Design a protein with these regions (language model features):
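N-terminal beta1-alpha1-beta2 module of alpha/beta enzyme domains
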Residues: 1-62, 189-192, 337, 355-361
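Hydrophobic faces of well-ordered beta-strands that scaffold small-molecule active sites
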Residues: 5-11, 39-41, 66-72, 95-101, ...
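Active-site mouth loops of central-metabolism enzymes
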Residues: 12-22, 71-80, 103, 116-122, ...
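Flexible, glycine-rich active-site loops centered on histidine and acidic residues
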Residues: 12-18, 79-168, 222-223
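Conserved, mostly hydrophobic/aromatic
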Residues: 31, 35, 59, 89, ...
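Glycine-rich, proline-tolerant flexible connector loops at the mouths of alpha/beta enzymes
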Residues: 38-52, 218-225, 304-315
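C-terminal helical cap(s) of enzyme catalytic domains, especially alpha/beta-barrels
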Residues: 111-120, 124, 134-140, 224-235, ...
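Long hydrophobic segments that form regular secondary structure
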Residues: 175, 182-243
C-alpha cells in the first residue's frame, strides 16, 4: 500500500495514574509488538499524575520502533522549553518523537502557576488555540534554526559549530516572543511530528495550520470523511499540501466482556461520549469496523483509547490488529525507524538552510 492509503493505528497508554515506569514500558512494548505507528500519553495540569513527556523519555531507550507522543499543554509553558523538550525526546528515541499540543482552560490550572488568569468566560477557546498554534509554529522554526550539518566538532580549530548555520527565528506571537536559535541541535526527524486533537472548531483551525496528524471525532464513515475533507481543505487554504496530513478517527474502546451482547444503542458502531466516541464490542467487531471505514476512504486510520489499558490494549494488539494483519490490511512490522517514516511523512528540510542556499545562488 502507498503511504497515502496505508492504514495507520495508534493507541493511548494513559489511564488511572500509575507511578511505576514498568507499567508504561509494558504497554508501549505491547503496542510496538503490534507494529502500531505510535502511542500517546495524555497529560493535563487539571489532574495529578506524572509528566507525560518525562515518562516517554523513560520509555524511549526500552523500545526500538514505536512512536512516542506525549500531550504537552501550551497555555502555561514557555514555547522555548516545549521545543527543547520535544527535540530532546526525538534525540533519545532516535527519531520517534511527536507531541500532542493541548490547551489549559480552567482557572484552577491557572492558579497552579499564578502567572496569568484563565481566559474569562467571554473569551473563546480560540484565543488559547491560536496561542497553541503559535507555539507549534515557533517550535518548528526553532527545530530548523540549526542546520543539519551545523555541528562540525573540529578539534584542530576548537570550533564546535558553524555559526553561519545557526539562525535567529525572531518570532513574535500574540502572547510571547522568541529570538532563538535553539540550544538543542536539529532533531533526527528534522521536525518531530505535531499531533492535534481537533474535536473542537478552534482546535481544528490550529490543526489545519500546523498539525502533521489530526485526531477527529466521528460516528459514521460519512461524518469522518466530511471532517477530514474540511481539515484538508483548510490546510490547503494555508498553503499546505493536504495530502501530507494524516487524519485518524479518535475512538474510545471497551473490549471487556465480549460474551455479553452489546449495550442497547452500541450495536451499530461508535456512539458519542463526551468529547470523543465510544465503541463496545469484541476484537473482531473492532477489526471489522476499522476495515470498513478505512476501505471506504473515510480516514487514514484510528487512534484508540482503551477503557482499561492493561486489558483492552492486549486485546487490540493480539485480537484486532492480528486479524487486520491476517487480512493484509495492516503491516506486520515497522518498515522504517522514525515516526515520520511510519506515517509516510517526508523529513522536512530546514527553512533557513533553504533560504541561505537560495541567497547564495541569487
Amino acid at each position: 500500500m502507498s503511504a497515502r492509503t496505508s492504514l495507520h493505528l495508534a493507541a493511548e497508554i494513559g489511564g488511572p495514574p500509575h507511578y511505576d515506569a514498568g507499567h508504561y514500558l509494558r504497554l508501549a512494548g505491547l503496542a510496538e509488538d503490534g507494529a502500531l505507528d505510535y502511542v500517546t500519553l495524555g497529560d493535563s495540569f487539571a489532574r495529578p499524575g506524572l509528566d507525560a513527556l518525562a515518562v516517554l523519555a523513560r520509555v524511549a531507550p526500552a523500545t526500538d520502533r514505536i512512536g512516542l507522543v506525549p500531550t504537552v499543554t501550551t497555555t502555561h509553558t514557555e514555547p522555548f522549553h516545549v521545543s527543547s523538550a520535544v527535540a530532546t525526546l526525538d534525540w533519545v528515541s532516535r527519531g520517534r518523537a511527536g507531541w500532542q499540543a493541548d490547551v489549559s482552560t480552567t482557572e484552577a490550572e491557572a492558579r497552579l502557576f499564578g502567572r496569568r488568569p484563565a481566559a474569562p468566560p467571554a473569551a473563546p477557546p480560540a484565543a488559547l488555540w491560536q496561542e497553541a498554534g503559535e507555539v507549534a509554529d515557533v517550535s518548528g522554526r526553532l527545530w530548523d534554526s540549526w542546520e543539519d550539518d551545523a555541528e562540525i566538532r573540529d578539534a584542530a580549530t576548537g570550533r564546535f559549530i558553524d555559526r553561519d548555520k545557526l539562525h535567529y527565528v525572531d518570532f513574535e506571537g500574540s502572547t510571547f516572543t522568541v529570538k532563538g536559535p535553539a540550544i538543542v541541535p536539529r532533531p533526527p526527524q528534522g521536525r518531530p511530528v505535531t499531533v492535534i486533537d481537533a474535536t473542537t472548531a478552534p482546535a481544528r483551525e490550529a490543526a489545519a495550520r500546523h498539525a502533521d496528524v489530526v485526531h477527529i471525532r466521528a460516528t459514521t464513515p460519512e461524518q469522518a470523511a466530511a471532517v477530514r475533507d474540511e481539515v484538508r481543505r483548510k490546510a490547503a487554504g494555508h498553503g499546505r499540501d493536504p495530502e501530507a496530513l494524516r487524519v485518524l478517527v479518535a475512538l474510545t474502546v471497551d473490549l471487556g466482556d465480549v460474551e455479553t451482547a452489546p449495550e442497547p444503542g452500541l450495536e451499530s458502531g461508535p456512539q458519542l461520549a463526551g468529547r470523543g466516541t465510544y465503541f463496545r464490542g469484541g476484537p473482531v467487531d473492532l477489526a471489522d469496523l476499522i476495515a470498513q471505514w478505512h476501505r471506504s476512504g473515510a480516514a487514514d486510520g484510528f487512534h484508540l483509547t482503551p477503557i482499561t489499558p492493561e486489558r483492552d490494549l492486549e486485546r487490540i494488539v493480539n485480537g484486532t490488529v492480528a486479524l487486520l494483519q491476517h487480512r493484509s490490511l495492516f503491516r506486520t512490522f515497522h518498515p522504517g525507524g522514525t515516526l515520520r517514516e511510519h506515517l509516510g511523512l517526508v523529513r522536512p528540510a530546514s527553512r533557513y538552510a533553504a533560504a541561505r542556499t537560495a541567497a547564495k545562488e541569487a
